[in-house]
């Protein structure tokens, strides 16, 4: 996803890996529910290619159809650099690919 975000933008990368029933909590707002709603929510917001993230923990269920990742992210802009952490819950699709069903995070002090 990092490579896709660097090339196409953060929002486009997330949409490429989002399950149709995705839930995306938003700071100070109700969560956005559904891939189409998420695409609409982001349609008027500026996208960025200057974000990267690195998982530090990943686990999958015994059945192999659900999993999660935890990690850190970094956003570099002209005037500042922001840091944070994230959580993502993944669901295996019928075609064997993984899509995320829940994704959220927050800002943190510099590591």
Question: How does the language model describe each region?
Answer:
Residues 9-62:
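A solvent-exposed, acidic/Ser-Thr-rich amphipathic alpha-helical stretch
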Residues 47-49, 75-81:
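Short, cysteine-centered beta-strand-loop-beta hairpins and adjacent loop/turn segments enriched
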Residues 83-108:
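Short beta-strand edge/turn micro-motifs at domain boundaries
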Residues 42, 55-59, 72-75, 85-92:
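Hydrophobic/aromatic beta-strand elements that line small-molecule binding cavities or substrate pockets
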Residues 18, 28, 62, 72-73, ...:
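A mature extracytoplasmic/lumenal domain signature
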Residues 1-2, 66-70, 89-90, 98:
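Short, structured motif recognition centered on aromatic/hydrophobic residues
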């Amino acid at each position: 996803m990092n490579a896709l975000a660097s090339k196409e933008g953060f929002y486009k990368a997330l949409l490429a890996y989002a399950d149709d029933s995705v839930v995306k909590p938003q700071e100070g707002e109700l969560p956005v529910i559904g891939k189409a709603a998420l695409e609409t929510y982001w349609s008027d917001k500026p996208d960025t290619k200057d974000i990267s993230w690195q998982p530090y923990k990943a686990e999958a269920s015994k059945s192999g159809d659900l999993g999660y990742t935890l990690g850190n992210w970094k956003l570099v802009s002209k005037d500042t650099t922001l840091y944070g952490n994230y959580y993502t819950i993944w669901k295996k699709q019928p075609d064997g690919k993984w899509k995320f069903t829940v994704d959220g995070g927050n800002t943190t002090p510099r590591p």
